[in-house]
Amino acid sequence: MGRRRGVMSDEFKYELAKDLGFYDTVKNGGWGEIRARDAGNMVKRAIEIAEQQMAQNQNNR
């Protein structure tokens, strides 16, 4: 079974890494070099953004 294709674009992931303060780690060592805590915070922030967008879309109806 192949790996599941990512839902987040690379551009969005880099933007989150910059916002959360570990972009230099990604730039210098790749995504495999980030801490599990940083990866978790990135997913948490992505979910928050998605929820905000969904709420905004629902309010615009």
Swiss-Prot record:
Q: Quick check: keyword Transmembrane in the entry?
A: no
Q: Which domain of life is it from?
A: Bacteria
Q: Name the Gene Ontology molecular function terms of this record.
A: double-stranded DNA binding
A GO biological process this protein is involved in? DNA topological change
Family matches, as InterPro entries: SASP_alpha/beta-type (IPR001448), SASP_alpha/beta-type_CS (IPR018126), SASP_sf_alpha/beta (IPR038300)
What residue ranges carry the coiled-coil annotation? none
- Which UniProt keywords are listed? DNA-binding, Sporulation
Annotated site (Cleavage), which positions?
A: 15-16
Biological role: May play some important role in either sporulation or the dormant spore.
What's this protein's family per the entry?
Answer: Belongs to the alpha/beta-type SASP family.
Recorded protein name is Protein SspF
Chain's gene name: sspF
